[in-house]
């Protein structure tokens, strides 16, 4: 075959196996796609591209000039940073329960944004201090088991889209909170899954 898709918990291992890594994989520190080219293994990460494509194409929300807050500072959040910056967001905030983890992510990601000559930098805040945003993205695993952090209502003020990276057969707790707060557009991450697969296939 010409390549392979990789999922949790093997994304970091796939990244370390590769002979070459795309800027997206380097920024994410993980790979979900391996391409085999002339005996070499090339790692890429299409998760963020899948999210951006889902938001802009399927949901019709242009990210250019918008304020985006990402909840969570784990591997899922890390893979979103470079593609969101490349989409032209005006502000990119990472909010985590513990601020030092968000700060560590920002410190890791900012050199990649500089290398791509992107003007935006990652702002790291504690979840309790997260600012309102045009687009709110939940990249935490909370909600996978029907639970989820109770978020301050002010977080949803002026929000155009609340997007949960996980997908389920019913609205996630994050989506339910957003709807209760009056956010008109909410989505789970099924389209992101489809989008990252389409991007992998294109590679």
Each language-model region and where it sits:
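Rossmann-like NAD(P)-binding element
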Residues: 98, 128-150, 163
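Short acidic low-complexity segments
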Residues: 114-133
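Short glycine-rich, flexible loops that bind phosphorylated cofactors or substrates
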Residues: 11-13, 144-146, 170-171
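Glycine-rich adenosine-cofactor-binding loop
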Residues: 45-48, 55, 59, 64-89, ...
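Phosphate/diphosphate ligand-binding glycine-rich loop within oxidoreductases
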Residues: 1-60
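Mobile, glycine- and charge-enriched loop segments
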Residues: 52-70, 131-135, 153-162
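Rossmann-fold NAD(P)-binding glycine/threonine-rich loop
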Residues: 33-36, 47-49, 151, 160-203
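NAD(P)-binding Rossmann-fold cofactor-contacting core
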Residues: 87-113
């Amino acid at each position: 075959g010409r390549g392979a898709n990789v999922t949790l918990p093997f994304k970091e291992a796939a990244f370390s196996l590769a002979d070459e890594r795309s800027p997206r994989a380097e920024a994410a520190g993980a790979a979900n796609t391996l391409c085999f080219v002339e005996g070499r293994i090339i790692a890429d990460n299409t998760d963020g591209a899948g999210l951006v494509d889902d938001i802009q194409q399927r949901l019709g929300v242009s990210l250019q000039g918008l304020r985006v807050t990402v909840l969570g500072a784990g591997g899922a959040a890390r893979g979103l940073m470079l593609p969101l910056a490349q989409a032209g967001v005006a502000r990119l905030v990472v909010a985590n329960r513990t601020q030092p983890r968000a700060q560590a992510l920002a410190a890791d990601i900012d050199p990649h944004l500089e290398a791509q000559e992107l003007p935006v930098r990652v702002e790291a805040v504690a979840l309790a201090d997260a600012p309102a945003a045009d687009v709110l993205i939940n990249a935490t695993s909370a909600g996978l088991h029907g639970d989820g952090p109770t978020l301050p209502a002010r977080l949803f003020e002026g929000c155009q889209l609340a997007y949960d990276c996980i997908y389920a057969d019913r609205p996630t707790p994050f989506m339910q909170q957003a709807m209760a707060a009056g956010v008109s557009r909410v989505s789970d991450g099924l389209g992101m899954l489809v989008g990252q697969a389409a991007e992998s296939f294109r590679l």
